């Protein structure tokens, strides 16, 4: 009987202490957990969960903030260890991690993982100091999540491509929220719908580190991601050691002549671990190519000295594995941000000073082919090749691949004293205001000497995309002239 009690205790510790599936109170089990990792929460279930969490725990706050195209307001959930939710108060003193979920309606992995993260933060299952604040949009594309498997907004826009142009109310609200939160680290949770197949449960994409700057970019590339990767691999190894030990202990116990019947009767777990389908739990992460346009949120973050990380869970993997891996990576990022908070704040100050001292601003980038790293890529051996390549999942394979993810500027401009925006361009002004761009009204009619750009030539697509014709290969000429400006 002692053996049985020991086995049950070890099992409880594994499930309870170091996995997302902590059952401190049945009141705060998520739909994902109640379904044993097969179902995601609906929008109403998500919001109800955070309402109950914020009512029960003083460290959690839930508020409505801005409007969306669906007519339903966005929510913002905040974890603050000392129950202080004035973000302006702590923007200089603590690292702020900002999480966005469900840009597409079928990106539910991050929605469920974030619910687990905030629940475990509230119940002190994640041990942190008071140096980090975690903020999240529970569901960004509300209309799409309510519609299920619908990627665009109710107005038929792709939010992933609307971060700068702000054609949607969602994107305009996101810009305002981002400026209010003023994060140090931004996490964008995605589900990766691709035909690619490999061992990874998730991959990641970051802000373009060269554009981010020498201080923050180097830290993101060489320290933060390295620490996250090392921590995940260590946890993966620890989980497997415990699981192997527990399985051996159970086998030995069940093979005992005198205790076999008692053990079978008294101890019948449905599974050894909630994550036992990952053999071993595969939390090794792999980078993907970095976007170099602020049309996407993680590169938009670079405009404000914020390190962006997009977590891409792989749709071909079991849902439980995806949510758990997503949770583990977010949790690890938060832990690193907590430990490195003072250093991150110092780097952010240095990066701001460096940016303000610049005379030129690069606005076009290309891959630097002279800088390359070789990375191990965990895939599978090819089984058959027809019109579609089939991989044999019983034969894992590790190959070395060349990875190019450093960029060099190809075009830049001399930073002017200011830009002049005519009042007729009110939509432009509204977007600049939403992005907290400093502006001053001209208070009297003025004749001013300015540098003016004229479009000399450009190319464009044959049909509009996302409400606009996308121009490219644009060439301008500059001349100096005197322009009459009106108040």
Language model: regions and residue ranges:
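Sec-dependent N-terminal signal peptides
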Residues: 4-13
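Structured catalytic-domain cores with a bias toward divalent-metal coordination
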Residues: 17-487
């Amino acid at each position: 009987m002692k053996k049985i009690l020991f086995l049950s205790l070890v099992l409880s510790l594994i499930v309870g202490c170091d996995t997302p599936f902590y059952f401190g109170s049945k009141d705060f089990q998520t739909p994902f957990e109640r379904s044993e990792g097969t179902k995601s929460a609906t929008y109403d279930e998500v919001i109800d969960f955070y309402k109950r969490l914020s009512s029960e725990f003083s460290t959690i706050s839930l508020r409505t903030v801005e409007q969306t195209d669906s007519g339903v307001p966005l929510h913002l959930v905040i974890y603050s260890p000392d129950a202080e939710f004035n973000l302006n108060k702590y923007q200089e003193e603590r690292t702020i991690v900002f999480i966005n979920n469900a840009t597409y309606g079928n990106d539910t992995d991050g929605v469920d993982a974030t619910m687990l993260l905030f629940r475990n933060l509230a119940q002190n299952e994640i041990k942190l100091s008071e140096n980090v604040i975690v903020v999240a949009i529970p569901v960004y594309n509300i209309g799409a999540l309510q519609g299920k498997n619908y990627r665009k907004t109710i107005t038929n826009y792709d939010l992933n491509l609307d971060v700068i142009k702000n054609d949607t109310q969602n994107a305009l609200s996101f810009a305002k929220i981002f400026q209010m939160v003023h994060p140090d680290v931004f996490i964008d949770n995605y589900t990766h719908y691709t035909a690619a197949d490999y061992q990874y449960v998730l991959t990641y994409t970051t802000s373009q580190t060269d554009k981010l700057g020498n201080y923050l970019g180097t830290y993101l590339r060489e320290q933060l991601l390295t620490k996250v990767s090392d921590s995940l691999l260590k946890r993966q190894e620890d989980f497997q050691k415990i699981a192997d030990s527990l399985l051996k202990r159970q086998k030995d116990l069940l093979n005992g002549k005198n205790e076999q019947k008692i053990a079978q009767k008294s101890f019948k777990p449905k599974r050894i671990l909630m994550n036992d389908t990952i053999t071993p739990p595969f939390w090794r992460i792999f980078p993907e190519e970095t976007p170099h346009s602020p049309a996407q949120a993680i590169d938009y973050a670079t405009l404000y000295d914020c390190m962006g990380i997009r977590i891409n869970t792989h749709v071909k993997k079991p849902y439980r594995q995806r949510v758990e891996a997503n949770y583990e990576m977010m949790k690890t990022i938060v832990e690193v941000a907590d430990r490195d908070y003072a250093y991150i704040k110092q780097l952010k100050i240095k990066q701001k000073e460096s940016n303000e001292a610049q005379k030129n601003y690069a606005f076009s980038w290309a891959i630097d082919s002279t800088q390359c790293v070789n990375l191990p890529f965990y895939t599978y051996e090819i089984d058959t090749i027809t019109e579609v390549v089939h991989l044999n999942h019983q034969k894992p394979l590790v190959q070395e691949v060349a990875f190019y993810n450093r960029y060099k500027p190809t075009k830049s401009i001399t930073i002017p004293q200011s830009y002049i925006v005519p009042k007729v361009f009110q939509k432009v002004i509204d977007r600049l205001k939403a992005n907290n761009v400093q502006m001053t009204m001209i208070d009297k009619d003025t004749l001013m000497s300015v540098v003016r750009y004229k479009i000399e030539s450009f190319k464009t697509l044959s049909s509009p995309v996302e409400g606009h014709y996308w121009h490219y290969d644009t060439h301008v000429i500059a001349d100096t002239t005197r322009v009459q400006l009106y108040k």
